[in-house]
Structure formats: C-alpha cells, structure tokens
Amino acid sequence: MVPLAPGAWLGLLGGGQLGRMFCMAAQSLGYRVAVLDPADESPAGSVADRSLVADYLDSGALAALAGLCGGATTEFENVPSAALEYLARSMRVTPGAASVAIAQDRISEKTFIAGHGFPVGPFAVLRSPDDAKRADPALLPGIVKSARLGYDGKGQIRVATREDVVRAFAAMGAKACVLERLVDLRREVSVVVAREDDGSLVAWPVTENLHRNGILDTSIAPARVAAGLAEQARSIAMALATALDYRGVLCVEFFVAPGDALLVNEIAPRPHNSGHYTIDACVTSQFEQQARVLAGVPMGDTFQHTPAVMVNLLGDLWFQDAGDVPHEPAWLRVLAHPHAKLHLYGKREPRRGRKMGHVTCLGATLDAALATAATIKRELGIPA
C-alpha cells in the first residue's frame, strides 16, 4: 500500500476509551481522525476531528467514513464484521473482518487456538440443553462462558455440577456457550503484539495482570516471571498473530498453570487494558502502533524504558460513601506523586464497575513503581 502521510484522515469504529487513546496517539503524529459510534459525546468522539453518531451498520455513515478516510480500524471486537467488510471494499481496514469474527465468538476463538496447536485449557461447546445435561464431569468445576459479548467478567457463571451447568446454560438464554474447566492459576499474563502487511512482528514486554471481580485491577510490567516463560509467551502471541494473518495490534491473554505451563485464555483483536502502561513507559505505545500499522508506515520500537504499574480507576471510586450521589475522587492526591501519570477517559456518568480512567506508576525499579501504586490505591480507597 501507499503509506498515508500525516495530515491524512484515519477512521475509527467505536467511541470508547481505547478509541480516545488511539485518537490522541494518531493526532500526535499529525493524522486526523473520524470516529463512528452510536453514542453522542463518546470518549473518542469528544476528542476526534470529526464524530459520526450513527449505528455501525448505517450505510450513510459508513459511506461518509469511506469517502473521508484513507483507512479504518476498530477499538473493540464487537463491531459488526459486516461493517468492516463494507469498508474494506474501498479502503484499507485493520484488522480484517475475518480476524475480528474469530475473536468475536468464543467458540470460534477456542476452536481456532486449539486447532492450530496452541496450548489451551480443556473445554466443551454447549449449543443445546442436552449438551448441558451431558457435560463432561472432567470439566467440573468449571466456568460457563457466553460465546459472544462477554468481557470484564460479564457472561460468566461458575459451575460445580451438571445441574449447575444446566442452570447456567438457561441463565445465558440457552444460547451457545463454552464450558471451561477451572485452571489452577499461578498467574495471569498478557502479551500485546503488532503485525504489518508483510508479516513483520513486534511485541511489548509480558504484563502480569491482577483482577478483582472479573475486571482488571492492576497490570505490572514487566511481569514477575522467569525469562523463559516470558519469551515463550511472546513467541506464542506472535505465532497466533501470524496464524490469524493479522494486521494491527493484538493482545493474547494467558493463564499460568502449575509448572509454569502457559494456556491461552483469549484473544483481543485491538489494543488492550493491560497495555495502557505503554503510553508512559515504552518508546512506542500500543495506540501509536495501531495508527502506524493502519497508515502503512514503519512500526515503532516497543522497548520499555521504565518499569511500570498500571491501576484501573473504576466508577466505584465515585461512590465510596455507599450512597447514590457520585463524588469526584481526590485526584490532587494522585497528581502530587511525581512518578504517577493520570489518565481520565472523559466519561460523563460514573457507574460501579465502569472503567473511568487509569493511573500508571513509574519507577527506577519495579519495586519503586509497586510502592507508588500501593500508596495511590490506599489514598484513593482502592482495595489492596
């Protein structure tokens, strides 16, 4: 492709915080960004050079985006693949619809991962009540996960018996699900990679992820794992991107089982929450890389120059008095820390469990970054 020079328009499907950070990164390179999202005043739309408020399948809005932009990308995986296919007829689209379609459906995703020989935990597909009734006892205790639209712990139910599986399947609306055996977790880690048209690949350092109530709470980079495990995780992530013939930024999440065995948990065909630290701690952030690949210019260096700990800021912080009236958290306490970088997403309505921002704590050592993160969490009232 002919590279798009700064000044060109880039299109974005999705208006959330990932899109907001993509806009800022692309604009810092000199590109202009048009965002298509159904919501008015979305986080990305509020900072974009142009905001198109319409359904993702609105033909007029898609035509306007295609007429304005030299390429388009997505900020989350549940954009209808039909919208990507429409745009791909007349412009460059990264990632491609086929890759996104695999990641949109947990059954397709698990089948793809296992079918290509990558390590994955035991699972079974549930498509009917009979499948649930005949659930393999070897997969219990386990978790029933909806095939589509599950994220941040949503669409997941823990089960211990076949009767639990039957109830969970019914609670999911009797729609296709995956039953996964519970893994004896040692850690959860992730790797963000980027891949160009010619197959060139880069990867950021492995990140260690700590969750609370199914939502990412803290990411530690680099992960506190053996060098061999980190290299294996990076190799698997890059091999998965190649198997998908992927274009753009991709995150692979892993479970670390006993014996440092890596199991692929899921794929996110986009920048990822666990990669937000790259904005402040790496030569090139995941969002700048997304813009670079879309524009067809050379990828930037992924070197991490500073240890980092990222802490998510959820809407719960606004409701610490146990009431229903939100109160702005004490951001001045965060800004008093010279090695902390505050990022708020411009969301107008705080809600419990909603990602409202993050803070990245930097340090000369990982222990120093961890100490700053612990202090900020304590000052804001975030559980340790």
Where are these regions (language model features)?
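ATP-binding N-terminal substructure of ATP-dependent carboxylate-amine bond-forming enzymes
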Residues: 1-111, 115, 130, 371
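Active-site nucleotide/adenylate-binding loops and adjacent lid/helix of ATP-dependent enzymes
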Residues: 102-190, 194-240, 373
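A short linear hydrophobic-aromatic micro-motif
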Residues: 122, 141-143, 175-180, 250-251, ...
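Short beta-strand micro-motifs enriched in acidic
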Residues: 194-196, 255-257, 345
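Protein kinase-like catalytic core scaffold
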Residues: 202, 250, 262-266
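Active-site "cap" helix and flanking loop/linker of ATP-utilizing ligase/carboxylase catalytic domains
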Residues: 231-252, 258, 268-320
